[in-house]
């Protein structure tokens, strides 16, 4: 079941692993992405911002192992840099699952402007992937944003 990012635990919360997985689920989707580290956020942040917004949980492997990613200075700097490069203001939380620290990046849905990657691509979150808009899809998307 898909949970909106506002259903995630509060900053500083501590959960048992079973409660965490029950809350967020193990499947990535439009509003949830798992990443082991903060190294590859430059596509995920703008894609989520141009979709429904969502949460990026750092410290979880592709196999859904809890590897851990504390909210240390390096992690915060990487998150801030990626968000700043695409002009999105994100919120950051640190939670503990079992004894494992995880960092959650909360990405807002942006409706009043276009957000691109630092290299100018317009991405949307489709399922569990970040997909580029191409051709006529770009103009339709931009026109829809201007109408609302």
Predicted regions and their residues:
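Conserved N-terminal catalytic/coupling substructures associated with nucleotide/phosphate chemistry
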Residues: 1-148
